[in-house]
């Protein structure tokens, strides 16, 4: 066992260095990317000792405005009219992936409002070594922190934002929910699940390596989210079953920013604060701190034993037992939760439209940068969902898996609502007379309103509705080295005929079908296989080679089957 420690450390060290170098190049090489240039920007002067409740409300409003804006790129969002501070940051190219995105929002708002800001810039595994700090089995611990210096003339905010990109990864969120150090404290804490504890600006961490910002909480309890991706694109969705519950040591789920204060600073005549140190409120001093999302609503016991039994946690609302995700929806609703199935399917279709639109940006970026014209690799990355280099920036396995999970959730949710309506559940409201027909009509209407175009390799355009994409969802290639026709799941025939992939890439596409059938991401299994090894199996959820049969995620097909059953059950009287 001992002989594995050093190689594991070296592997982690080399990857960390490579990632840091990549981040540096990303910011500083003007030939490859936008240059981070904050010419004409205001310096970051700290004039407030702490964030007030008014500041927090202002931050929530800022996040909500950006979330609501029609922007699909990080830089475009911060340069949009939704940003009231856009005239003050000078010439600066904003870049972020999902992990950096919440920190970029928080730091930027602090800069524009003279607020203190600090962040954890070093994390290590809670125990043992790891090949990738983002996917440790027992979570991470904070080992170092950095604060924006409080100086008389202010500091260059651009340098802070660049530091964030090299310091923050999804591993920065992977810490125990009870972590409570006074010195190396975590930037965030676990909040109470209600409309006071979760609001625009709150964060959700997905154990499978994704982070989103809450940008709105609807009156019906739906939590709307916005996130960034390695290609700098922005996507919008909503909180649901694609965010898995886990042991609290991994810190998954909802998070809120921990309040900090600049202590011991000297105030100059112009109001600028100089010197001092950053302190944070401990968990016990936070009115919204809660482990409810891990232990449930029916106990206040936070012992290690209870935390270890997180799978047995129970959730209830107004005396009614609910599964966790239904509970979140009910707890976040304004008043008693009621769901109209027709409105629910429309909302989910609009979210899917956002997902498809964001995916188009990712695919187009790979094509624009010529990744599809590069030779196929000999084998896949060690894990296709979390890696480095071209694959990390231009592939879409995680994005595609989240999309398929959203489809599965849509199907299961509508099926449950139909059953609840049939049982007369008070939480389901429907005023019509033909629920199945109205659901199909709403589905088709939303599908037709969301049209995506892609340009084939021969320059002609293909038009896809939401339903078209769903029909071919398990044929959508996540592999950036493949032609755009395969990235959009073109079937053999006219549409696929313009694909210029080599026979080697043909072999890859066929072998990767097992991985395309997956909807659950597995970051802790080896997936670095060749096409022959993928074909040979064994296949299974945790095999690293994918599964043979794709799950049923097609809600329209389900509704059609119900409609046909209804029609078949109608007795036609004999003619007399």
What are these regions (language model features)?
Residues 37-170, 178-183, 266-576:
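Mixed-charge, low-complexity intrinsically disordered regions
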Residues 185-193:
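Active-site neighborhood of thiol-dependent amide/isopeptide-bond enzymes
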Residues 192-199, 204:
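Short, well-ordered loop/turn sites that connect or cap secondary structure elements
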Residues 207, 215-237:
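Catalytic Cys-His active-site segments of thiol-dependent hydrolases/isopeptidases
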Residues 233-279:
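Glycine- and charge-enriched low-complexity intrinsically disordered segments
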């Amino acid at each position: 066992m001992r002989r594995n420690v050093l190689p594991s450390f070296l592997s982690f060290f080399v990857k960390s260095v490579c990632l840091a170098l990549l981040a540096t190049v990303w910011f500083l090489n003007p030939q490859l990317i936008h240059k981070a240039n904050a010419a004409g920007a205001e310096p970051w002067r700290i004039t407030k000792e702490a964030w007030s409740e008014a500041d927090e409300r202002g931050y929530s409003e800022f996040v909500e405005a950006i979330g609501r804006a029609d922007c699909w790129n990080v830089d475009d969002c911060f340069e949009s009219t939704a940003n009231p501070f856009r005239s003050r940051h000078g010439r600066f190219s904003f870049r972020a992936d999902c992990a950096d995105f919440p920190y970029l929002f928080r730091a930027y708002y602090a800069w524009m409002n003279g607020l203190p800001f600090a962040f954890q810039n070093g994390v290590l595994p809670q125990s043992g070594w790891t090949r990738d700090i983002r996917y440790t089995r027992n979570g991470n611990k904070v080992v170092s922190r950095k604060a924006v210096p409080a100086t008389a003339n202010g500091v260059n905010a651009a340098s802070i934002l660049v530091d964030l990109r090299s310091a923050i990864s999804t591993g920065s969120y992977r810490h125990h929910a009870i972590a409570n150090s006074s010195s190396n404290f975590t930037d965030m804490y676990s909040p109470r699940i209600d409309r006071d504890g979760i609001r625009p600006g709150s964060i959700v961490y997905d154990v499978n390596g994704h982070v989103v910002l809450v940008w709105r909480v609807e009156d019906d309890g739906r939590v709307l989210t916005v996130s960034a991706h390695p290609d700098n694109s922005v996507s919008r969705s909503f909180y649901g079953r694609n965010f898995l519950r886990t042991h609290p040591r991994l810190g998954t789920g909802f998070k809120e920013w921990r309040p900090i204060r600049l202590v011991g600073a000297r105030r100059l005549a112009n109001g600028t604060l100089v010197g001092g140190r950053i302190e944070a409120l401990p968990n016990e001093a936070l009115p919204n701190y809660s482990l409810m999302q891990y232990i449930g609503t029916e106990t206040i016991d936070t012992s290690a034993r209870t935390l270890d039994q997180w799978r047995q946690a129970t959730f209830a609302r107004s005396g009614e037992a609910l599964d966790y995700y239904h509970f979140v929806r009910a707890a976040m609703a304004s008043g008693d939760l009621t769901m109209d199935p027709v409105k629910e399917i429309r909302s989910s279709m609009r979210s899917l439209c956002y997902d498809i639109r964001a995916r188009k940006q990712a695919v187009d970026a790979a094509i624009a940068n010529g990744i599809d014209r590069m030779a196929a690799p000999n084998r896949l990355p060690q894990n296709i969902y979390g890696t480095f280099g071209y694959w990390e920036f231009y592939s879409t396995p995680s994005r595609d898996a989240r999309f398929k999970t959203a489809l599965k959730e849509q199907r299961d949710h509508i099926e449950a609502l139909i059953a609840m309506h049939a049982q007369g559940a008070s939480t389901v409201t429907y005023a019509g007379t033909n629920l199945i027909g109205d659901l199909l009509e709403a589905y088709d209407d939303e599908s037709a309103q969301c049209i995506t175009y892609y340009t084939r390799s021969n320059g002609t355009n293909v038009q896809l509705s939401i339903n078209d994409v769903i029909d071919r969802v398990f044929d959508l290639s996540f592999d950036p080295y493949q032609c755009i026709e395969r990235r959009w799941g073109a079937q053999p025939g006219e549409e696929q005929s313009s694909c210029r992939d080599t026979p080697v890439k043909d072999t890859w596409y066929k072998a990767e079908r097992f991985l395309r059938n997956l909807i659950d991401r597995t970051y802790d299994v080896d997936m670095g296989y060749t096409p022959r090894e993928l074909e040979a199996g064994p296949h299974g959820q945790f095999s690293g080679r994918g599964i043979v049969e794709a799950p049923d995620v097609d809600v329209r097909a389900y509704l059609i089957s119900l409609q046909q059953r209804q029609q078949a059950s109608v007795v036609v009287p004999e003619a007399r």
